Amino acid sequence: MANTDAQNDGLREKLVAINRVAKVVKGGRQFGFTALAVVGDGDGQVGFGYGKAREVPAAIQKAMEKARANMKRVHLDGGTLQYAVTANHGSSKVYMQPASAGTGIIAGGAMRAVFEVVGVQDVLAKAIGSRNPINVVRATIKGLTDVDSPDAVAARRGKKVEDIVG
């Protein structure tokens, strides 16, 4: 399901989904392909891309290029999340919570691909509602980018980082 390629720029690439689509025209059906890909550096940066083309390799190439252009920063706590978070996109809802070291990635499908490329090693996650891969990837990335760093939380509350982290 998820395909990994190591490029020379050090980014991890995963192919999440490929779909065959059809456009009905007067002469019959015109087939095309869509590809959903996620790209990350394994250290807190992640992006996703959705490519469409008449051939599978071209769709994958477009998806990878869009993912590289759409990179976002995520604040991680070692190999896990800072705190539990919920995010929505469309009717897809994802719940993610930090896990102790050695737990691994307890997540399914499209969420697992995002966690692997962003550099999360230990997380508990669940997709609720629609499990459409595009919406699940969007919700997962939205949730990860909404997590604030301890520095930002401390500054907002007017406290020291040590008081926040405990």
Curated annotation (Swiss-Prot):
Q: Which PROSITE patterns match?
A: RIBOSOMAL_S5, S5_DSRBD
| Recorded family membership | Belongs to the universal ribosomal protein uS5 family.
The UniProt keyword set, sorted, is: Ribonucleoprotein, Ribosomal protein, RNA-binding, rRNA-binding
The record ties this protein, via InterPro entries, to:
Ribosomal_Su5_D2-typ_SF, Ribosomal_uS5, Ribosomal_uS5_bac-type, Ribosomal_uS5_C, Ribosomal_uS5_N, Ribosomal_uS5_N_CS, Ribsml_uS5_D2-typ_fold_subgr
Q: Name one GO molecular function term.
A: rRNA binding
The molecule here is called: Small ribosomal subunit protein uS5
Domain comment in the entry: The N-terminal domain interacts with the head of the 30S subunit; the C-terminal domain interacts with the body and contacts protein S4. The interaction surface between S4 and S5 is involved in control of translational fidelity.
Could you tell me the superkingdom of the organism this chain comes from? Bacteria
Q: How does it assemble?
A: Part of the 30S ribosomal subunit. Contacts proteins S4 and S8.
Every S5 DRBM domain range: 11-74
Give the encoding gene's name: rpsE
What's this protein's function? Answer: With S4 and S12 plays an important role in translational accuracy.
Might you report a single GO cellular component term? small ribosomal subunit
Q: Which NCBIfam families match?
A: rpsE_bact
What Gene Ontology terms for biological process does this UniProt record contain?
translation
HAMAP family, alphabetized = Ribosomal_uS5_B
